[in-house]
């Protein structure tokens, strides 16, 4: 169950998106939180030499084209979601506040915990998509640019899959966590393209 923050920060509970509810009216602040702009000092490159300079990268690119998958067609979204009524054994089982919860509250806590984890995966995949897209312009060789573009496309599918799962299955989306946000900010705003490969 989401915890309230102290001070003037918005409560996490107020920032959880519940897809089971009717579309809410968004305030100007909420709209600003959704579309965030970041600036970077990246230097892009054109490479007019279209010869293959690294066969390993060329092979990765070809493999990526061959093994493509489609979120809409390759995942059975109509398959019923099986939700176990069993409460799994967890490391916090002996934590007194958790022990006091009813089974119904424990299941709700686990639902929110799972939704929070899936949300962080989604936000991380969007970060990976943005990093891969930056690499397309920054990579020094033609083949590296092609591979970075295929990687961006793959990350786009990850974003699509997690979004679809959250909106249609868990129906709860948590905001990006502060640790992940800090890491994404550092990577996306760094001007060194080779750092983004790590």
Annotate each predicted stretch with a short phrase.
Residues 93-107, 126-138:
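A short glycine/small-residue-enriched secondary-structure motif
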Residues 128-189:
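Long, hydrophobic, well-ordered secondary-structure blocks that form the structural core
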Residues 40, 69, 111-118, 140-157, ...:
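Alpha-helical scaffold segments that form or flank carboxylate-/histidine-based iron centers
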Residues 13-70:
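Eukaryotic intrinsically disordered, low-complexity, charge-rich
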Residues 1-14:
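Single conserved hydrophobic/aromatic residue that forms the stacking wall/gate
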Residues 72-101, 115-123:
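Conserved oxyanion/phosphate-binding beta-strand-loop segments in alpha/beta enzyme cores
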């Amino acid at each position: 169950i989401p915890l309230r923050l102290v001070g003037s920060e918005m409560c996490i509970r107020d920032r959880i998106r519940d897809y089971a509810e009717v579309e809410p009216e968004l305030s100007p602040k909420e709209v600003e939180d959704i579309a965030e702009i970041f600036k970077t000092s990246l230097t892009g490159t054109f490479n007019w030499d279209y010869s293959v300079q690294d066969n390993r990268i060329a092979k990765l690119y070809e493999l990526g084209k061959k093994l493509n998958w489609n979120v809409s067609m390759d995942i059975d979204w109509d398959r019923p979601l099986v939700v176990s009524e069993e409460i799994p054994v967890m490391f916090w089982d002996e934590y007194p506040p958790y022990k006091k919860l009813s089974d119904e509250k424990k299941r709700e806590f686990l639902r929110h915990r799972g939704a929070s984890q899936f949300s962080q995966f989604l936000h991380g995949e969007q970060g990976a998509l943005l990093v891969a897209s930056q690499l397309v312009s920054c990579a020094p060789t033609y083949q590296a640019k092609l591979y970075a573009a295929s990687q961006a496309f793959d990350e786009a599918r990850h974003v699509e899959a997690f979004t679809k799962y959250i909106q249609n299955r868990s129906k709860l989306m948590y905001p990006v966590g502060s640790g992940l946000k800090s890491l994404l900010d550092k990577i996306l705003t760094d001007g060194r393209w080779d750092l983004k490969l790590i």
